[in-house]
Amino acid sequence: MAHVVRIAYKTIYNCIEQGVLDIGVADLPDHGIRRRRAKETRGTFSHGRSIEDRPAEVIDRHTSGHFEADTVLSGKRKGQAIATFVERKSRLIIVKRLQGRDSTSMTKAILELANQLEDNLKPLTVDHGKEFANYKLIEEQARIPLYFAHAYSPHERGSNENRNRVLRRFIPKGQPIEEITDDELIQINWYLNSRPLKCLNWRTPIEIFLRNLRH
């Protein structure tokens, strides 16, 4: 009987870099996808609830309303950014413009989302970027817990990372967010949610999300 051995992405990359495996990074199926960040440029902090403490209903995707959140930046050090919120069950993505890359801008976006979705917004899974530093205020005012992924582990927020990669087809790195109009953001957001996905049995995120709202 065969046994399945699970190996972390980091272990594979370390073995390649050390020459233990006779292959290169380019030989990997997803070699164009970075599994770890070379350097975190946004600033970080180390507090908050661990992703390991998330309840089972968040992990198994059987319950709607659980979101992953992230920030999409341009190539500039300052200026606007985009907040992305991805619902884990339906893969629905909600895109919001941020006037800055700071915690105040992200806090405003999350509280706005909480006001819009009301009881349909449940725990958020995020990273330790400085834009989430106001997590205590968010938890208090939005009445939802925030769970933080481990450092340099974007795969722990895989739904968000995947949707962000598709978003980058429309907003490539280096393009100032200020150049994108509100109408263009709406159109991009609608396209992403209207596109059938294999993981949804070729249904669309908006279809699944709205169906869950009715039940």
Where are the language model's segments positioned?
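Two-metal-ion RNase H-like nuclease active-site motif
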Residues: 64-74
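Short conserved beta-strand segments at catalytic cores or DNA/RNA-binding microdomains
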Residues: 72-94
